[in-house]
Amino acid sequence: MNKLTITLTLIFLTSVCTFAQKKQLGHDELISWNRIQNSQISNDGNWVTYSLKPEKGDAVLKVWNSKNNQTQTFERGEGAKISGDNQFVVFKIKPHQDTVTAMKRRKVKKNKMPKDSLGILNLATSDLVKIEDVKSFKLPEKWSGWVAYHKEIEKPDTTKAAVDTTQMESPDTTQTKKKKSKKGKKKRPKKEGKKTGTKLVFRDLVTGKEEVVEFVMAYTMAEEGPRFLLNSTGKDSTFEEGVYLFDCEKEELKPIFVHKGEYKNMTFDKSGSQVAFHANLDTLEMLIAPYGLAYWKDGDETATILVDTTSQFLAEDWRVSESGRPSFSEDGSKLYFGVAPNPILQDTSLLEEEIVKVEVWSWTDDVLHTQQKNNLDQEKKRTYQVVWHTQENRLVQVGNMSVPEIQKGDEGNSDIVLGYNENPYIKSATWRGFPNPRDLYIVDLKTGKKKEIKKAVEGSGRLSPKAKYVTWFSAPDTAYFSYSIESEEIVQLTKNENVAFFNELHDSPSYPSSYGISGWTEDDKYVLINDRYDIWKFDPTGKERPVNLTQGRENQTRYRYIRLDPEARNINSNERQLLHVFNEKTKASGYGFLRMNTGKPVTILSGDFNYSTRPRKAKDTDKLMFTKQSFTVFPDILYSDFSFQNIKQVSEANPQQKDYSWGSGELYYWTDLNGNKLTGMLYKPENFDPLKKYPMLVNFYEKSSDRLHSYRAPSPGRSTINYSFYISRGYMI
């Protein structure tokens, strides 16, 4: 009896141990581990959306409510956007990936493949509307109530569709009544296609009412005004080919340019009251498409062609280029567009066998022949900027061969731009390497006159937000410089006397880079420049002494400014600013706040984790989402306000990790043969026993110990060691 009891007990304990033993990561896990994609937070901070996507397989959309901590799940949902009024989520519903793969193997024709569907979720009621066969959609961020979606080519018989991703029938509304011609022949109805377009639908999100426009090729929307712009190939005499504006408030489709042609690069100004686009009205299919630039504003009956091949403004053998999208300044006072010289055309009278196919290379070329081939498409699309002053009806050539590139100032509102020219130094770049020197210019947008401010700058010049200064980091001088537009004086800002503003750990045979600029304060008064650890406040005129705002060097703590408002053009010196904090010695990180006028930053959250450097804040509240990670902690989405006291976990991307043997990482110190003290990382399997021997992998690659607290997701790779995979299998790294 005792023997039987002992035997049963041993069997039970063995079973328990076997059951409790964690699994090793296998190759299946390399392709099934989830990543978080396309995360966003609503303007009011009450909603967070994100997709979970494995290496291979279908994504899952998650919609989280901060009020009740509940999450809704939508299979195969991707690319979600939250409406500006926080009432709706609009997203794509993809077909099953396995289905698509199987059909590709069977070589099913593209038009028979399953298409994406559209999902519209009402956040208040949780009602979901699905619309099949949608290839794209646009949901405005700064105004609300409408969504536009572009349909796929309609199938003649929807009952024969290969896969219906929403299980909904789509009525065929494209058929028109057939009219008999005078000769008694039936006129075929126009069909949708790549050259004729498909349906564009404007949907009122609240009422569900829809306005359908047929045979649409492309569409866009205004940033702030409730308007959409589209071009259609037309249907008949009642709806002709051209460019149309849909006003959501009036629910009205207005023709702004009716003409047969080809239209590209439609754009609004910020308010939606002005429109520009490229128009090719030629019907002869010339080798060089004669595009013109069209313009329309509120109150105009029709758009007008500002510039085309007949305009005296253009130099001989130059044209309006359709390669670059025209753009308005923020205040709408300027319209920028590109012009280019006509390309060299091939002799079309030659037969194919008469065309000599040879590549000619010369040692005198400024650019290596292989690089010329690599850059060929880019050079074919190169444009030179022109500005049209909308109030003055005046064109000014800004860019040309001597100043081929420009940077706009003050969101395009400024009357000057910064010009670049690296052409004189292109050849020497072959042996000099990066950065390529360039000459810097200030270009007057009223006159087109160019003033050279500095030759052969080995670094990128940038205009300040209000276009009062130009700053650049000179690589040979390892210093920042500032140029005043008003005084026309150059000032060296950083001296590298007590603190280096170049990469202190640079160890390659080239010039060291800088640590970057955090930004500018209001009205371009100060520029904030980073060193290895700290943020410094500099007077761009050089009159005031620089001020160290963060004082992190003593403790080897690095502070970096976090830009929470993507549209903020300056840093408000009177408000507290969120900083990312990282300690180089311990590798701990976190967040802190800084008030520039009151002293040192205050750390409010810190730990042995890698906290995200770019948390995202809700537009209208102090709620934000961020991540933290370590070798054992996946970077799931976290949610909090600026106190960081009540942190909620939003996502749980890989709950299965608890079932697998993982491991841990720690810093490892040693002295090299030259007597230098070095820092590395040592990763050990879970339940590491120092008395046992383990197989070990050694990875020498640059400086990676700062990534001690980085999560290493199982994933396939060609030339890297997947840490979690090997450690799970008993290796040390």
List where the protein language model places each region:
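Positively charged n-region of N-terminal signal peptides that target proteins for export
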Residues: 1-7
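Bacterial N-terminal signal peptides
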Residues: 7-15
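Beta-propeller folds
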Residues: 13, 20-623, 629-635, 639-640, ...
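Serine-hydrolase catalytic core recognition
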Residues: 613-733
